[in-house]
Amino acid sequence: MLTLGIDTSNYATSLAVFDTDAGEVVCDCKKFLPVKEGQLGLRQSDALFHHTAALPAMLSELGARADLTQVRAVGVSARPRPVEGSYMPCFLAGVSAATAFSLSRALPLIELTHQQGHIAAALYAAGDFTLIERESLVFHVSGGTTDLLLCHGAERITPLGTSSDLYAGQAVDRLGVKLGFPFPAGVYVSEQAALCKEKVHPKVSVHGLTCSLSGLENQCAKLLADGHDAPYVCKYCLLCVGETLVRMANNALAEHPGLPVVFAGGVMSSDLIRTYVTNRVPNAHFVPGKFASDNAIGISILAARECGAWPTTSM
């Protein structure tokens, strides 16, 4: 049995097909939304337009790589997070496409959230199959969240901590755009950071399970004004994010000892952050970039789980 996942976030249009019998992702595709040089993202109306324009061709591409006539359920990100009042218009494009696809074939439509998709993709790809069935601490770190969550799979989520102001992805993107890189700028900031061989000493603000990242933007601006080069400042920015996560994770582990700690979200694609955190947090799980950044893989997996089609008893 195949399931189709659709996610239309403020960053990318994403589709994925999951095979419940094999327990594998058959194929996936993603297209970043076009952002003009110097801008930090799109207005919601523009994001909705670009998703609507991209989806037909992307579904056609997906159909060339998988037999969509074998899809038996459709999952879609209908809103950002599974909390009351969570809403962004960009997700309407995905809901519209998913609804049309499911109705045309009399298939069940499963409405999920963008955050649940991130969590499911990370748990699936973390290298330990049991993670998707048991309790874990999950960080969702992106341009719109810096959340620490207590999760049982991706279905039962309890918020534990977050940023009180700026999100990690916002800090990274603002630095990257300031340096002249396209949005989203995470990959370029990571490339620059890898060029720096100097030691940096990040200064962070963490109180229990809550962090503050608003000072990071000002710190980076001051470092640039003081004459530090781009690689140094990029490394400083990413290690500040890394040290923030280390402190939040270890504080959470003091309250929930022994739990695995899984890192999801686009910012967690950084090799520098991955190395820094895994050396300091026990039982930390990072995943390959395509499972960390925006994707529809987790949504296709959750559609299968909601239908009771995966995991199968033979696995």
Indicate where each model-derived feature is located.
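N-terminal phosphate-binding loop and adjacent alpha-helix
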Residues: 33-66
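Conserved phosphate-binding catalytic cores of ATP/NTP-utilizing and phosphoryl-transfer enzymes
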Residues: 1, 107, 111-136, 301-302
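Short glycine-aspartate micro-motif
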Residues: 3-6, 73-75, 136-140, 262
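Short beta-strand-loop/turn "lid" adjacent to the catalytic site in phosphate-handling enzymes
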Residues: 60-99
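Glycine-rich beta-strand-to-loop/alpha-helix junction loops that act as flexible
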Residues: 76-79, 142-144, 262-270
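A contiguous, well-structured pocket-lining segment that forms one wall/lid of small-molecule binding clefts
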Residues: 190-261, 267-284, 304-312
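A short helix-loop
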Residues: 8-9, 16-18, 23-28, 130-134, ...
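Glycine-rich phosphate-binding/hydrolytic loop that grips phosphoryl groups
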Residues: 118-122, 287-315
